[in-house]
């Protein structure tokens, strides 16, 4: 019985991962492109550095979500988070917020037919 439960848990985990999408965001000049990402719980958002010195720093995030503050430059070219809590995540570049370098991630619940991950 334990083997069946373990196999079922592994299957559910792999099915959820199969639905997860990656949402790329380019970090360059004074802009995140795209500035708004629409995601589903379990998806990832991946920032890729192009030029300059920047951060991706969470501002307001849903309760229970993890904050982040990552420096991005020629030595730190990629950063990724998995969104696990539905809601709106606002973030910015600490160096260029005055120039409008901000972004938003809007996360909805599980898509139809997707099995939500459990802890």
Where are each of the predicted segments found?
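Extracytoplasmic copper-binding redox domains, predominantly the cupredoxin/blue-copper superfamily
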Residues: 18-119
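Cleavable N-terminal signal peptides
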Residues: 7-8, 18
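N-terminal signal peptide c-region/cleavage motif recognized by signal peptidases
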Residues: 13-15
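Short, low-complexity polar/charged micro-motifs in intrinsically disordered terminal tails
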Residues: 9-11, 114-115
């Amino acid at each position: 019985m334990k083997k069946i439960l373990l196999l079922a848990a592994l299957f559910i985990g792999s099915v959820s991962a199969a639905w997860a999408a990656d949402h790329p965001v380019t970090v360059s000049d004074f802009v995140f492109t795209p500035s708004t990402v629409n995601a589903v719980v379990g998806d990832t958002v991946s920032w890729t550095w192009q030029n300059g010195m920047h951060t991706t720093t969470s501002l307001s995030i849903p309760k229970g979500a993890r904050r982040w503050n990552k420096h991005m430059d020629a030595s730190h070219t990629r950063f990724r988070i998995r969104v696990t809590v539905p809601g709106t995540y606002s973030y910015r570049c600490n160096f260029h917020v005055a120039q409008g370098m901000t972004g938003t991630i809007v996360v909805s619940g599980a898509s139809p037919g997707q099995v939500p991950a459990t802890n």
